[in-house]
Structures are given as C-alpha cells and as structure tokens.
C-alpha cells in the first residue's frame, strides 16, 4: 500500500475515532463539524484518485505482461497454424493424387472389363445367331425330308395297295383257272378211262373172235399190252 493511501486511511481513522468523543457542545458548533467533514471528504477524494491511478498502472502492467506472453504464444500459434496448413495442404494434395490414381485405375479396369465382356458377348451372340440359322436350315431340311418321306410312304402305300389288289386278282384268276383245270382234268380222266375201256372192249372182242377162229390162245395180259 502507498504512503498516501496509508495517510488517508490513518486520517479517516483518526477522525472516526474522534467523532464519538465529541462533546455535546460540538453540536452547537456546526462550523467545526463541517470543516472536519471537508477534510475527511478531501482525504477520501485524494485516496480515490490515487487508487484509480494505481489501478490504471496495474492494468497497464498487466496488459504489458499479457502482451509480453501473448506475442510468443501468437507466434507459436501462427507457426503451428502455418505448419498445420502445410500439413493439410500436403495431405489433401496427396489424397487428391491418390484418389485420381484410384479413379484412373478403376476407370481403366472398368473399360477393360467392358471391352472383354463386350467382345465375349459379341462372339457369343454371333455363335448363337449362327447356331440358330443352322438349326433353322436343319429344321427346314428335316421338314422337307419329312414331307418327301411322307410323300414316299404315301406313294409306297398306294403302290403296295395296287400290288395287293393285283396279287388278289392273280390269286382269284389262279383259283378260277385251277378250278377250271381241275374240272377239265376230271373230265379228261373220265374221257380217257372211257376211251381205254372202249379200246379194251374192242381188243377183248377181237380176242374172242380169234378164239372162235381156232387161233392159239393168248393170255389176258398179252392182249392188254399188245
């Protein structure tokens, strides 16, 4: 505490200690009381002014101290900020390059994949088209063959039917001829038998006539086979 402040405090204390001991006559002397009060007020005013100056000085010293510590701190913060900015810039640059490389690689792989599968799909589509064309041609060939076979089968059945009818007609004719032949053969045999019997009768009659004329006798077998 400053000497001026201690002096004002002692004066105020002294006046305060003196006030209770004032005699009742002091109330009858207002001039003395007013003078004493003015002294107290002046001392307090000086004390207030002194206290305000000291506070301003202390505030200035505090500001200087804060500024003294704040300058290195700001410098460190500025350096850290610049370092952080460089690190972030470098990191973002590296990240951007990495992302570009990844995107480029991915794009190249996707293009290669699309080209490979596009080529495979094109070849497969070409093969499917060729197979479908061959299948269509084969189906047309089979259809034509089937129609030809159907036509051939129909013609064969018609020819077979005609031949069966012809065979039936031949069989009927053969049976008719056979029947006629059998009938004619029976008649021929009967006619031949009748002719042989007539010849035998003639020979027997001739033999009988020869016997009558006293010819040497002959056996019946000699007569039959002569």
Curated annotation (Swiss-Prot):
Region of interest: Disordered: 1-66
UniProt cross-references to PANTHER family, sorted A to Z: X-LINKED LYMPHOCYTE-REGULATED PROTEIN 3A-RELATED (PTHR19368:SF3), XLR/SCP3/FAM9 (PTHR19368)
Gene name, Swiss-Prot/TrEMBL: Xlr3c
Composition-biased stretches (Polar residues): 21-30
Family named by the database record: Belongs to the XLR/SYCP3 family.
Keyword Metal-binding: no
A Pfam entry, by short name: Cor1
Protein name, entry field: X-linked lymphocyte-regulated protein 3C
């Amino acid at each position: 505490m400053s000497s001026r402040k201690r002096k004002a405090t002692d004066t105020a204390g002294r006046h305060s200690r003196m006030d209770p001991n004032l005699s009742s006559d002091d109330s009858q002397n207002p001039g003395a009381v007013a003078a004493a009060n003015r002294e107290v007020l002046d001392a307090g005013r000086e004390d207030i002014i002194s206290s305000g100056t000291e506070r301003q000085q202390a505030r200035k010293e505090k500001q200087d101290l804060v500024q003294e510590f704040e300058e290195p701190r700001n410098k460190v913060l500025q350096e850290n900020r610049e370092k952080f900015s460089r690190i972030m810039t470098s990191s973002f640059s590296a990240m951007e390059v990495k992302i570009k490389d990844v995107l480029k690689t991915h794009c190249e792989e996707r293009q290669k994949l699309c080209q490979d599968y596009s080529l495979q799909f094109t070849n497969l589509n070409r093969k499917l088209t060729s197979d479908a064309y061959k299948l269509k041609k084969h189906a047309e060939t089979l259809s034509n063959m089937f129609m030809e076979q159907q036509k051939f089968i129909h013609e064969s059945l018609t020819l077979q039917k005609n031949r069966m009818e012809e065979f039936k007609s031949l069989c009927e004719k053969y049976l008719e001829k056979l029947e006629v032949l059998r009938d004619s053969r029976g008649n021929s045999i009967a006619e031949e038998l009748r002719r042989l019997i007539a010849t035998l009768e003639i020979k027997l009659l001739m033999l009988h006539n020869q016997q009558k004329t006293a010819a040497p006798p002959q056996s019946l077998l000699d007569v039959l086979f002569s």
